[in-house]
Amino acid sequence: TALQRGARVYLPYIEPGRLRLWFTPYCADAAQAERAHGRLKIPQFHGEKIRAHRLNTLLLPLVGIDSEGYRLGQGGGYYDASLAATRHRLQPHKIGVGFACQRHNGRLPREAHDMRLDGFVCEHGWRRF
C-alpha cells in the first residue's frame, strides 16, 4: 500500500461553516474524534492541517465524469472551492475515483470555476485526460 511504501496520506477535514477543505494526515493508530453534530458523523482527525495546493495528488469522489475529464460532484461545493483556490499555485494531480457506470460519454454541465481532472480510475482501469 501507499502507507507501507512511506507515502503520507491526507484525508479531507471540513471546518464547520467553511467551504474550503483542509487536509490532515491519516494515521492508522491515531484516535479519531467524531463531530459532535451533523447528520453524517464524519470522523475528524487532529494534527497538521494543509491546503490542497500542498498535496502531490488529490483523489476526488464523484457522481459522474465526462469524456473531457470534468466531474460532477455531490453538490456541496467543497472540492470545487478547494480546487479554485489552487488555480494560481502549483496544483496537485487531480484524479477522480469512481465506478465505470459513472462515466458519461457526452459533456456534463459545467461552470466557469470547474476544473478538468487529470485522470479517472475505476474498477476497469485508469484513464488520463
Residue ranges and their predicted role:
Residues 10-13, 60-61, 97:
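Short, conserved beta-strand edge motifs with alternating hydrophobic and charged residues
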Residues 48-58, 65-70, 80-129:
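Surface-exposed, charge/polar-rich loops and edge strands
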Residues 19, 78-79:
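Short phosphate-engaging motifs
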Residues 22, 61-63:
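Short, basic/glycine-rich phosphate-binding loops at helix/coil junctions
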